[in-house]
């Protein structure tokens, strides 16, 4: 039985849930990969993360020119500041001594939506060459020149949020770019030869679905190494702190659409998604959508996977590691 993402995108909630419950959407993956990245303490009866193994560093400290309504630099405050190449190298060396095996390099954006990566390329190359750490990089809008430089420096994978609505880009992201710029960024990443993992954000437009299917269609013109679905999560102290986040079934529509559109591409439910009671539903619906991995899975979701006789593994990697893990487990 084959399914069209557009067709079930329009189905009623009950029809959609019935479809997921049949298990016919896509074959069950050989192994479910559960991730507990080091930027947040995570503990279940099955696994607990270690805070130094795969931390997130901000190349701009808490600075960001955009002041996006959903973040307002609050997310940057949770990262270790490494706002000069020298600081990046020094902190990477210390982390290596503490048992770190990988880094996620992130940061705030410039007015054009890019992250100022170019000045850090020599430091990244040194970290790869001398410390042999896995390095993932959030890119934002990116040029071919910078993408090639990251590839030559040895970056393992580039992570990029793809927004499929010009209105969302402008109203929420405070950005004067369009979906075409995200398309061009994916083209640059693919041309450079970098492994790249697009992220689709569910409910970024005031908690409502808008442009997520279009984002997947943009990605479909390329050959991503993996896809990660994340969801708007209200952050205390921001303009959107009181916005109701997307419901589990809305997040599931996007993960299911991604699975149907990319049947052979590793797919994960990422770390950013609503907390609380809805998290359990979100996680279990993701498993029913045949994702290959979940970051910070709820205890109940792990039990569900166990009851369904999934094989599963745990790791402190960033969940973008699914681009390798899912392929190796086949």
PLM segments and residue spans:
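Flexible, acidic/Gly-rich N-terminal and inter-domain linker regions that tether
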Residues: 1-62, 66, 329
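Conserved C-terminal portion of the radical SAM core fold
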Residues: 180-240, 250-270, 297-298
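Conserved, mostly hydrophobic/aromatic
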Residues: 68, 105, 258, 286
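Radical SAM enzyme core and accessory elements
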Residues: 1-22, 279-284, 288-330
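Glycine-enriched alpha-helix->loop->beta-strand junction motifs that scaffold or abut catalytic
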Residues: 151-158, 193, 221-225, 285-293, ...
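Conserved Radical SAM active-site core
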Residues: 46-55, 73-172, 176-196, 204-214, ...
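Short acidic, glycine/proline-enriched helix-loop-strand junctions
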Residues: 113-115, 131-133, 176-181, 237-251, ...
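Short beta->alpha connector loops
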Residues: 40, 139-143, 273-277, 297-300
